[in-house]
């Protein structure tokens, strides 16, 4: 986690300017990287369902999570991170889609208020 963070920050130093920054995975101690089959048109949906199951299973064990699209984009866009991406050894035609940060929560923030103006019920 630390070395891939250093590689990404080398190419994009502004990332490290965030308050409390430790790594590109929201300071999580563990990360799962999800890759999709670029030849299958429903692969991204399947990966979303996979991630949901990982997140729910982790929560049932008291482990918090955060789904991260930006971390995956930073890795894909960073030439310095290419060796780490290569070490992930995804199968042919597979591409990194997103990451899931995992760890024991150290806070319990209140839920944000729901925007009722964004909800529409239809009969």
Regions found by a protein language model. Give the residues of each.
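Acidic, surface-exposed loops and disordered segments
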Residues: 1-123
């Amino acid at each position: 986690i630390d070395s891939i963070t250093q590689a990404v920050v080398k190419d994009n130093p502004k990332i490290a300017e965030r308050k409390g920054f430790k790594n590109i995975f929201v300071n999580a101690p563990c990360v799962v990287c999800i890759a999709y089959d670029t030849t299958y048109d429903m692969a991204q949906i399947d990966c979303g369902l996979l991630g949901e199951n990982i997140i729910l299973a982790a929560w049932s064990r008291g482990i918090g999570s955060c789904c991260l699209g930006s971390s995956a984009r930073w890795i894909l866009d960073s030439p310095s991170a290419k060796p780490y991406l290569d070490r992930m050894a995804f199968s042919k035609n597979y591409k990194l889609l997103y990451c899931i940060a995992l760890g024991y929560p150290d806070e319990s923030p209140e839920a944000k208020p729901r925007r009722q103006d964004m909800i529409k019920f239809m009969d």
